[in-house]
């Protein structure tokens, strides 16, 4: 069986020159980022698909107390239309109080489905413990589940997770370092010394010498005006400057679970000879029942018959010549009929032998 490689190769794989990209496409402004919010709440109005756990009852009782309704200590409410949930959202930079956020609601307990439910007012907090938004509204759930009387069950997608578009109102904004200090710092999404230097050079070519300087393989510091309005137009100019990213380092990335192999253009192989054989062992179990005659005083016995077969496939040896490229590597492994798991073993062996020039990453 020939190997079918799923090769996700970047533009470099076809030996094309690197294309210039805008700074906004390859870097972020330091401090300008999303902030994660999370809360704990109740979803009500479920059509019998909620939960009856102790902490659900406790949360429900606490909510009633907040409304001035006190239940007896020994009273356990029988609720099947309520579920405790985790609510989370991402709060973008510069968002202001009164604006809205999309929220995701996920069941924390044994609720069968959140379909048809409504989230009650839930405080969304940041990592500092402060409340930044309040969420409430009807859930949109794409999944569903149905149970039959005979115990059969049908589940489509994930019925215990839903979303509320514009379901949270921002109550507090988050300060960013954008409007303070004498500098703006860009952080590359993919660290590379050459790209950082090229970015600084491109900015200096437009704004003048010594306006930008690379701090390391990730960060480029740029002198910026103090006035906020000038800083906005200044950044609008910077983020549209085009930079030609440096070539990626030679890498081979293998997903051992799916068999996906990603090979960069710069991967080279030194001379090496490879052969890979496979031993297959098959064990088949057959069960036989020996039933005695009805008039005989015997017992029913169950016996097992095992059949074991072993076979070893023959593989041809192939050789990598100096400077073997990606295309030649793919053709070679296809020629010997290697499976994805075999390719992983071959690549690991080549790396250990020093014949693979590139970083081997297994995910």
Swiss-Prot record:
- Superkingdom field: Bacteria
Pfam families given for it? Answer: FlgI
Q: InterPro entries given for it?
A: Flag_FlgI
Please give one Gene Ontology molecular function term for this protein.
structural molecule activity
The residues the entry assigns to the signal sequence are 1-20
The record's subcellular locations are:
Periplasm; Bacterial flagellum basal body
Q: Which GO terms describe its biological process?
A: bacterial-type flagellum-dependent cell motility
A single Gene Ontology CC annotation of this entry is: bacterial-type flagellum basal body, distal rod, P ring
**Is the keyword 4Fe-4S assigned to this protein?**
no
Task: For this UniProt record, give its keywords in alphabetical order, as a comma-separated list.
Answer: Bacterial flagellum, Periplasm, Signal
Q: Explain the purpose of this protein.
A: Assembles around the rod to form the L-ring and probably protects the motor/basal body from shearing forces during rotation.
- What does the similarity note say? Belongs to the FlgI family.
Question: What does the subunit section of this Swiss-Prot or TrEMBL entry state?
Answer: The basal body constitutes a major portion of the flagellar organelle and consists of four rings (L,P,S, and M) mounted on a central rod.
Which PANTHER family is this protein grouped with?
Answer: FLAGELLAR P-RING PERIPLASMIC PROTEIN FLGI (PTHR30381), FLAGELLAR P-RING PROTEIN (PTHR30381:SF0)
By what name is this protein known? Flagellar P-ring protein
Q: What is the lineage of its organism?
A: Bacteria, Pseudomonadati, Pseudomonadota, Gammaproteobacteria, Alteromonadales
